[in-house]
């Protein structure tokens, strides 16, 4: 009887590990395929360099802010949750930012490359891969925790991204705190998050006054928001493919290898390892959300943002592509190790 139970437990564990690998492949393959389509469109001159640049600007100033607004607004209920994992995530992202800031200063003298590398170190593809990943790892509980966490990590990612791209300016211009703060306030992505938070707060006030009202009640308006949201990611990926140059791989090999190792190896070890050692109260659902923060690839939105704010957009694009490929393994091994430690048992 005990042997049978042990065999069943091993089989169940193997099934989960297999599912993790399949999920990792299924999560990243649509991203890579869309990038390839963008690359093909460039080769047949349907997506020219000028058009790609114009679309990137449109994505950055319209589609991504609407997507972030919608992601925040869709959080159904904060309910009763432990703020510990939220505090941990935000502090860990800040520490990663600080450590990587020191690293890029010593690693390269090119301010544009510094900005792209620094942004790529901490900025996870949370909305596109992270939340579905949390659901795959720990079901409805995982996605509930990850959704709540998104209200805090997405603003954190974007604030630090603006700082990353503001402090390194070509020509050795010293960072101006006032300009950086103004850049944060004026940044379309930050404005999208802020608008989503305000709408969420208004909705909560309505609920407390027994007035049930949601944007979804205004069907035409919400349908437009949904359409614009759905355009953000595929357009970003198509443009990424159109701007991707294989010739740049050799030129940027040192930066690509360093960026991918940081994002796909060191950060998962740091973020998940410290949480496992010191945060004993975290359960499987919290760790599912943390995997989404620390083990996923670099956010696609980092490319249009790098282009619009004068960083090395070519390097940013290369980092997104190669970190996405590497994330197949980082996601798999993160879930495998956590499962073997009994976190996802």
Language-model features: locations:
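Alpha-helical transmembrane segments of multi-pass small-molecule/ion transporters
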Residues: 2-345
């Amino acid at each position: 009887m005990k042997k049978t139970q042990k065999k069943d437990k091993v089989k169940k564990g193997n099934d989960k590990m297999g599912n993790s690998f399949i999920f990792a492949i299924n999560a990243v393959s649509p991203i890579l395929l869309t990038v390839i389509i963008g690359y093909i469109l460039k080769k047949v001159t349907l997506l020219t360099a000028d058009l790609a640049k114009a679309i990137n600007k449109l994505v950055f100033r319209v589609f991504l802010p609407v997507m972030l607004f919608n992601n925040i607004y869709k959080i159904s209920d904060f309910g009763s949750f432990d703020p510990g994992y939220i505090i941990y995530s935000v502090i860990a992202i800040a520490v990663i930012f600080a450590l990587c800031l020191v690293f890029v200063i010593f690693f390269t003298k090119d301010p544009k490359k510094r900005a792209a590398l620094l942004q790529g170190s901490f900025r996870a593809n949370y909305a596109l891969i992270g939340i579905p990943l949390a659901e795959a790892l720990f079901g409805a509980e995982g996605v509930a925790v990850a959704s709540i966490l998104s209200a805090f990590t997405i603003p954190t990612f974007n604030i630090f991204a603006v700082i990353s791209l503001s402090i390194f300016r070509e020509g050795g211009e010293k960072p101006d705190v006032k300009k950086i703060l103004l850049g944060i306030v004026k940044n379309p992505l930050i404005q999208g998050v802020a608008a989503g938070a305000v709408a969420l707060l208004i909705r909560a006030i309505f609920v407390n006054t027994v007035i049930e009202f949601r944007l979804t009640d205004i069907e035409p308006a919400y349908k437009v928001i949904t359409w614009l949201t759905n355009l953000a990611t595929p357009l970003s990926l198509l443009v990424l493919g159109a701007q991707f140059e294989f010739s740049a791989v050799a030129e940027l090999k040192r930066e690509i290898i360093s960026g991918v190792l940081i994002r796909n190896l060191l950060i998962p070890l740091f973020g998940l390892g410290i949480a496992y050692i010191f945060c004993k109260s975290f359960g499987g659902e919290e760790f599912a959300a943390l995997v989404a923060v620390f083990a996923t690839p670099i956010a696609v939105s980092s490319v249009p943002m790098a282009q619009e704010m004068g960083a090395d957009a070519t390097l940013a694009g290369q980092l997104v592509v190669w970190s996405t490929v590497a994330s197949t393994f980082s996601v798999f091994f993160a879930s495998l190790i956590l499962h073997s430690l009994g976190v996802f048992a």
